[in-house]
Amino acid sequence: VHLTGEEKSLVTGLWGKVNVDEVGGEALGRLLVVYPWTQRFFDSFGDLSSADAIMNNPKVKAHGKKVLNSFSDGLKNLDNLKGTFAKLSELHCDKLHVDPENFKLLGNVLVCVLAHHFGKEFTPQVQAAYQKVVAGVANALAHKYH
């Protein structure tokens, strides 16, 4: 993904303030609530019967944290997202059979959650930079599908 120096600074500056535990669980939870068909990939997570059940589900929170820790790794390797996410792309494609469109959906949900958490600090410039990053990550995760 190509980011200017300023965009990289905006992304990494805000990311340093992100509570990965909280934001990860919230982003994944919101994905499962807003796009209920994505729940089929999480059959082993127990109760996903309502928005409250999903948002308070410890397995959703734990996996959300795991997802954002991987996203953090991507932010450290913006010039090699495909390499950074190669194994995860293979896992999600070959073993889990996740629709690659879901990566885009989760990226967009993450941007919304960050905007909610950071308010005015999440400026249009920050949003634009994050949109580039989540698109790049989604593309890297979908790489093995091509």
UniProtKB/Swiss-Prot annotation:
Residues modified as N-acetylvaline are: V1
Q: Which residues carry this modification: Phosphoserine?
A: S44
What residues bear Phosphothreonine in this entry? T12
Q: Does the keyword Metal-binding apply?
A: yes
Question: Is Nucleus one of the keywords UniProt gives this record?
Answer: no
A Gene Ontology BP annotation from the UniProt entry: hydrogen peroxide catabolic process
Q: Which residues carry this modification: N6-acetyllysine?
A: K59, K82, K144
Which tissues carry this protein?
Red blood cells.
Please list the residue ranges annotated as the Globin domain: 2-146
Q: Name one GO molecular function term.
A: heme binding
**Family (UniProt):** Belongs to the globin family.
What name does the UniProt record give this protein?
Answer: Hemoglobin subunit beta
